[in-house]
Amino acid sequence: MTVLDLSYNFANLSVHDLLEARDTYHYHLLSKANVVGTAIGLYLIRKDEAWPTRKGEGKTPPNKKTYARTLSNSEVRDYSWPCILAFVRSWANEDAFGPAGRYDPAQIVPKTLYLADGRAVPVCVVQADQAGSDTSATYSPPGILPAHKLGGGSPIIVRVQGAEYSATAGCLVSDGHLTYALTARHACGEADTRIFSYLRSGEVEIGASSANQLTRKPFSEVYPDFPGRRSYVALDVGLVRLDQVDDWTSNTYGLPPVGPLGDVHEKNLSLRLIDQPVLGRGATSGLVRGTIKALFYRYRSVGGYDYVGDFLISPAEGLATRHGDSGMVWHLDATTEDDAANPKPLPKRDLRPLAVAWGGQVFEESGVRSAFSIATSLSNVCKLLDVELVTDQSRGVSGYWGRTGHYSIAAFAVALVGDTDLRDFLNRNLGILSFDLDTIAEKGFDKSVGQLGDNFVPLADVPDEIWKKLDHGKNGREGGRDVSAGPHGSDGPEHPNHYADIDGEIGPHKTFRAACLADDSNLTVDAWLQYYETMAAKAKADGDEDGARRHRNKLKQGLLPFRVWQFFDAMVAFVENKDVVGFLTAAGAAAHYMGDASQPLHGSVYSDGDASRTVTRHHPRTGEDEEVSYGSGVHSAFETAMIADKAAQLFPLIKQELSGPGGHALPLLTSGKAMAKATVELMDKVAGILEPMRILDSYEQAGAGTRKATLDGMWKDLGDDTAQVMALGARYLAMLWESAWVHGKGSDIPVRNLTDQNPQDVRARYIQTSFVPSLTLDKIGDELT
């Protein structure tokens, strides 16, 4: 090449240049039968191509590879230049075109597109055969759902003409008057169609579809400064008008608190976005990760018009989007790493909501299918719908809504264990028992539990997340112990093991709880069965037939202290048999029950309100007043919503309660019956510190529900005492662990066996229904020693 020959500096090409070239050659590219789509991006270099050692070798390598370039065998390198990407069904070398070749020369895709003013735009040909997508008829959750708050990543369900359609709630937006969940239009239906979602307890009705929806817009209307004469920007975005905004958080489940909008427009949109990492949470797939592979992907042409998606996103291995993830928001990972060798954990990453996933493109290569996500700019969506991104709705709620209490009590208890070998063993396996306290206190929390599904669940939540489930069906779990399904969730023998309504008045004692503490003969199965029969007879005499039936129902007769007795016996047996996996599994699950015992509402007939009196509440959906029990809804508001919302303030208070010397400071026990009595003792202490009716009164006086004002009011009234009862729970749990360890002669177990355990070995234990079996009160006696 001489100085007089034309030389093109492709690196100077802009997004505008690339779009202009594609627009100019619109019909030319459209005529290529082998071309299935085009986009703009950076030139893809085959991964085994030698890196250039001299100037110019990047574009013209001395030993250029000629085999088919695909999305999986090529990559963007730091010297990749701007180009138009042309995706073709099949690959053919140049000698296959022409008189002696198999193909018409007119069908060859040009290497360069030349504009009238002399600019030249390179074309990168990529083999990426389109394939049909996988679909699923009904929604199936990817893992454990939130117990309480809905937010980004929650499922959106609509039923139209006998069919069910699912999508994902991407984020919250507001028009200044109302707040909406943004999702895919196809899961909204016509205006005012009722929309549903799911929490752990089952299906919930959340609102109605808005008439404000998007389908497609002319490219020139969305991007007036960019060329695109015969193109549509494809959009599939709808809004759900929420019945109760306080049921929602602006955060995405399992991700850090939502960051500022990743604002994209003609003036700042550049190819620097190529290969940038993004992540999101789909209602079907759970956590997904990917990289931006191309911009303005033309995936279809109809009647001479192109249909274009703003972003083509390549999935990370094993983390692709699926049917039901439409509406999900992709977050740009804009984190600045302080140490590249130790990247920041997910809760501390800087994520910017960037794009709404509305569709997918499945490419097939050598029989392997890869689902790429097609997404549109969230800033464009907000502009076209005339709404703004909401970032401050219940910001403190993110990650594990409803788990904070159980996990934190287990984490605090480990440090209180006196036996050095046991404490070290539990510390080494804290990730199996629970999470470390700093992780639990993070507003974003980590992603682990939210992605679990039928994989490993930290033990402190196994009784809720595994055993209180069916072992089959849409919300089933392997290892589930429930036996019947109903309109409000499933039921089974595990459920009554989590509480004991023993503050009913009986005999000379003020409560049956007091009777158990005063006389050990009341700590028997027969005495408890008689107590429930007495309560049933009393309810019937008072005209409360529902109450009478409830007290006689075996699945409603709480037996929490006997469940702790059963676990003490099991842990002792595991230690005696030197079965460290069995002991660890039982110890972690037992943390859940001792956590329940430390919550006053788990030991009270007022567990979710006082049925003897009513209050008038305004129904958010019907707009009408309704009569409900006094304190109705208090259980989840106090134990789930308030504790999760105030975790960052609560944990320092608990640490202060536990700051003195002496570990748990409780005597070690040597029998299951003594441990059951200690559990009743704990329930009595916490009821004295935080009387159940006081919780109900605070809830009603603060306005009821789970609005921020309600949670703030309850925290002001109850915060200090909540820390005190949770600290007591940690002390009694540490005492339970250490008592079983010492009584079973844990000192006989070689220290070399007290190592890090495999979570899958632990899971293999707890999915067995015979592992510390869940039994009703009338059946548990045979298990107790």
UniProtKB/Swiss-Prot annotation:
GO biological process: defense response to virus; proteolysis
Organism: Bradyrhizobium tropiciagri
Span list, region Disordered: 470-503, 608-629
UniProt feature, compositional bias: Basic and acidic residues: 470-481, 491-501
Domain of life from the UniProt record: Bacteria
Record's protein name: Probable serine protease Ga0098714_109514
EC number, as in UniProt: 3.4.21.-
Alphabetically ordered keywords of this record: Antiviral defense, Hydrolase, Protease, Serine protease
Cleavable signal peptide: none
Principal EC category: hydrolase
Example of a GO MF term: hydrolase activity, acting on ester bonds
Function field: Probably a dedicated protease for substrate gasdermin bGSDM; cleaves the bGSDM precursor, releasing the pore-forming moiety, which integrates into the membrane and triggers cell death. Involved in defense against bacteriophages. Expression of gasdermin bGSDM and this neighboring protease is toxic in E.coli on solid medium.
Taxonomic classification: Bacteria, Pseudomonadati, Pseudomonadota, Alphaproteobacteria, Hyphomicrobiales
Family classification: Belongs to the peptidase S1 family.
InterPro entries xrefs: Peptidase_S1_PA (IPR009003), PLipase_C/P1_nuclease_dom_sf (IPR008947)
Transmembrane segments: none
